[in-house]
């Protein structure tokens, strides 16, 4: 993935790459910058790494992508589909409302400087989830030692 492709990877909640994958933020070779994708890439790899890769336009391999936080997992090419299927299986076991709320929780934590307000919002969120039909099903399934019955 190069340029905008790296931006797409950075937007993914879960990113799996094959060992053969190559990456590069090569816009500076053209006298340009990865400005449009920069918020997503910086959020994924951090400002220090972004400064290096934006400025040098150096290509990097999948292991480097994992080390800097662009991808979560690197697998042999012949295991890529199975690794993605495993992630989908794990996501399918999560409650849909809880999974969506987890994404919002991360956004809120990053965006909120007021920790007291964040603690209050988080307490309200978990209270809403506990009494929701999904929360009740999840807790009931846990107590009954069974798989939750929800649609994902």
Q: Where do the model's predicted regions map?
A:
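C-terminal long alpha-helix characteristic of the crotonase
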Residues: 16-21, 71-120, 127, 133, ...
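Short helix- or helix-capping micro-motifs
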Residues: 49-58
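Acidic, divalent-metal-coordinating active-site segment for phosphoryl/phosphodiester hydrolysis
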Residues: 58-64
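Glycine-rich beta-to-alpha active-site loop
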Residues: 1-30
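Glycine-rich phosphate-binding loop at the start of an alpha helix
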Residues: 3, 35, 59, 136
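Terminal low-complexity tails and localization/encapsulation signals of metabolic enzymes
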Residues: 140-152
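Hydrophobic, secondary-structure "cap" segments at the distal end of domains
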Residues: 39-48
